[in-house]
Amino acid sequence: MPQKSRYSDEQVEQLLAELVSVLEKHHTPTDLSLMVLGNMVTNLINTSIAPAQRMLIADSFVHALRASIDEGNIH
Protein backbone atom coordinates (compact mmCIF):
# COMPACT_ATOMS: atom_id res chain seq x y z
CA MET A 1 0.00 0.00 0.00
CA PRO A 2 2.38 2.70 -1.17
CA GLN A 3 0.59 5.70 0.23
CA LYS A 4 1.81 8.58 2.34
CA SER A 5 0.85 8.02 5.96
CA ARG A 6 0.79 10.12 9.08
CA TYR A 7 2.20 7.08 10.91
CA SER A 8 5.85 6.12 10.85
CA ASP A 9 6.99 2.82 9.35
CA GLU A 10 8.24 1.94 12.84
CA GLN A 11 4.78 2.42 14.39
CA VAL A 12 3.15 0.31 11.69
CA GLU A 13 5.77 -2.45 11.85
CA GLN A 14 5.65 -2.63 15.66
CA LEU A 15 1.87 -2.99 15.74
CA LEU A 16 1.96 -5.52 12.90
CA ALA A 17 4.58 -7.58 14.73
CA GLU A 18 2.44 -7.62 17.88
CA LEU A 19 -0.67 -8.72 15.98
CA VAL A 20 1.26 -11.46 14.17
CA SER A 21 2.71 -12.58 17.50
CA VAL A 22 -0.78 -13.03 18.97
CA LEU A 23 -1.92 -15.08 15.97
CA GLU A 24 1.23 -17.21 16.11
CA LYS A 25 0.90 -17.69 19.88
CA HIS A 26 -2.51 -19.27 19.30
CA HIS A 27 -1.32 -21.28 16.27
CA THR A 28 -4.10 -19.61 14.31
CA PRO A 29 -4.70 -21.10 10.86
CA THR A 30 -4.82 -18.70 7.92
CA ASP A 31 -8.57 -18.92 7.40
CA LEU A 32 -9.30 -18.13 11.05
CA SER A 33 -6.75 -15.29 11.02
CA LEU A 34 -8.50 -13.76 8.00
CA MET A 35 -11.92 -14.16 9.64
CA VAL A 36 -10.75 -12.48 12.85
CA LEU A 37 -8.94 -9.66 11.06
CA GLY A 38 -11.94 -9.13 8.78
CA ASN A 39 -14.24 -8.94 11.79
CA MET A 40 -11.86 -6.45 13.39
CA VAL A 41 -11.95 -4.23 10.29
CA THR A 42 -15.76 -4.44 10.16
CA ASN A 43 -16.02 -3.55 13.84
CA LEU A 44 -13.65 -0.59 13.47
CA ILE A 45 -15.60 0.76 10.50
CA ASN A 46 -18.99 0.27 12.18
CA THR A 47 -17.97 1.79 15.51
CA SER A 48 -15.48 4.50 14.50
CA ILE A 49 -16.69 5.89 11.17
CA ALA A 50 -19.78 7.99 10.55
CA PRO A 51 -22.50 5.97 8.80
CA ALA A 52 -22.41 8.18 5.71
CA GLN A 53 -18.68 7.47 5.25
CA ARG A 54 -18.59 3.72 5.96
CA MET A 55 -19.00 2.45 2.39
CA LEU A 56 -16.43 4.94 1.09
CA ILE A 57 -13.93 3.82 3.73
CA ALA A 58 -14.70 0.14 3.07
CA ASP A 59 -14.24 0.64 -0.68
CA SER A 60 -10.94 2.46 -0.09
CA PHE A 61 -9.77 -0.34 2.20
CA VAL A 62 -10.69 -3.01 -0.35
CA HIS A 63 -8.91 -1.08 -3.11
CA ALA A 64 -5.75 -0.71 -1.00
CA LEU A 65 -5.87 -4.39 -0.01
CA ARG A 66 -6.25 -5.55 -3.61
CA ALA A 67 -3.41 -3.26 -4.71
CA SER A 68 -1.11 -4.71 -2.06
CA ILE A 69 -1.73 -8.39 -2.89
CA ASP A 70 1.29 -10.13 -4.42
CA GLU A 71 0.00 -12.47 -7.09
CA GLY A 72 3.25 -14.44 -7.26
CA ASN A 73 3.42 -18.08 -6.26
CA ILE A 74 4.35 -18.88 -2.66
CA HIS A 75 4.71 -22.63 -3.13
Curated annotation (Swiss-Prot):
Alphabetical list of InterPro entries matching this protein: UPF0352, YejL_sf
Disulfide bonds: none
Superkingdom of origin: Bacteria
Pfam families: DUF1414 (PF07208)
Family: Belongs to the UPF0352 family.
HAMAP family according to UniProt: UPF0352 (MF_00816)
Record protein name field: UPF0352 protein PMI0824
Organism of derivation: Proteus mirabilis (strain HI4320)
Lineage of source species: Bacteria, Pseudomonadati, Pseudomonadota, Gammaproteobacteria, Enterobacterales
